[in-house]
Amino acid sequence: SSLAMKDGDFLTNNDIFEKDGLAGTVNNFGDINAFKGGAIALIAPQVSNQGNISSSEGSSLLLSGDKVKLTLNGNKLIHYSVEKGTIDSLVENDLAINAGDGVIILSANGLAEVSQSVVKNSGTLQADSILKKGGKIYLSARDGNILNEGIIDTSSVQGSGGEIEITADEISIKPDSQILATGDSGGGQILIGGSWQNSDPDVYQATRTLVEEGVKIDASAISNGDGGEVVIWSDIHDRKSLTQVYGKISAKGGRNFGNGGRIETSGSRLNIKNIFVDSSSPFGTHGEWLIDPYNITITSSGNAKHAVTGSSPNLTWTANADSSEIDVNDIITALSSSNITISTDGVGNGSQDGDIIVSAPLTSSSTNRLTLDAHRHITINSQINLAGPISLEGDDVILNANIISGSNPSNTDLSYIIGKLSGSSGFSQDTAFLSVQASGDSTY
C-alpha cells in the first residue's frame, strides 16, 4: 500500500490504511503469490497490475481510495471497506489475477463531486475451480465507470459455477470479452448493473450498461443441473438509464438433465437488436428471458433510439426518444430456446405509462411461452401466430390484428388474457385452452 498506517493501528493489528499527505501509486510488474487461503491486497489511490497475482483459495484485492480498512483472521480476509474516496481513483488489471476457489475484488471509490472512479480489466480474472463451486469476482466503481475487455471466469470443472458481480454508474463490456460462470453440475450467477428485478438492494444499480457485439456471457450448466442466472440491468426507474445488449447470453440446462436458467435484460430505455439469448435445456424445461423497459414496441427493425458518443470508459448515452424497440426477429430466434417475458414498469421517474405495442408480424413454431405483461395497455397491430401459448396481461388488451396460439396440436398449455379486451380482431386458440379474465366492459 502507498497509504499510511498509524502506529497504534499497527500495534493492535488494525489494518487501516489512510492517506496522509501525498500518496503514490502501486504498480505490479512481477509475480505475487500467496500461500493457500491467504490474501493479497494492493491499496493506493491508483492501482495497476501488469504482472501475475495468485492466491489459491484465498483473496486478491486491488483497492483504490484514500482510506481502506481490511478485516483479517490470520491470513484470511473476512471483510474490506473503502471508507474514503480519492481523486482520479483508478484500478486496472492488464495481465492475470488468479484466485482458484477464492475471491477477486477490484474496487475503486472516487470523489463524485471532483472526479469519477474507473475500474478497467483488459487481462484475465480467474476464480475458477476443479471440484468445488466456482469462486467469486467483484468489480465495483460506484458513481464511476467500469470497462472490461478481458476474461472474467468463475467456472467449475466438476462443481457449479460461481458468482460475478459488476457494478458501477456506467458499465462497458467491449467486444471479445468473456464473462463465464459455467459449471458441470450447475450454472452460476452473473450480475451486471443490478440484481434480478432489483430484488437485492445491496447490488448497486447502473445508469448505463453496454454489452457490445462479440461479447460472450455464459452461466450454463454443462453436464447436469440447472442453468444459472444472468442479469444485465440499468435502473428502470431512472429516466436517464439505458441498457444496450448486443452479445451472446446463455444460461442453458445440463446436456444430461436439468432445466434452463433465467436471463434478464432491463432498463428504462432498452436496445437489444441482434442479441442472442439461450436458456434452453435438452431434457428439462426451457428457461426464461425477461425484458423490462418502460414502453416497448415490437417492430421489424428494432432501431436504437439513442446516440453514443465519447470513448471508453467515458461513454455518453443520449436518448433521442422515450420508447424502446425490439426487433421481432430477435424474439422469434430466442423463442426457439427460451420462454420470453416482455414486461413494462411505467412507475418511478420515467415519463411513460408502460405500454406494449406489437407492430410487426410475429410467427414462431416453438412451443415455448410468450408473455406480454404491460403496466397499462397492450396493443396488437400485427398478427401473432404461435405454436406455443401466449399470455397477455394489461389494463387494456386491444386486438387490431389476430392472435393464433397453440397451432401445434401437441401443445396443451394454457393461454390467457388478463385485462379489458377490445378491438376489431380476435384470438384463436387451436386446442381451446384459453382463459379470459376481464374487469370492466369487454368487446371481442
Set out the residue ranges of the language-model regions.
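Extracellular and secretory-pathway beta-repeat/beta-biased strand scaffolds
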Residues: 1-444
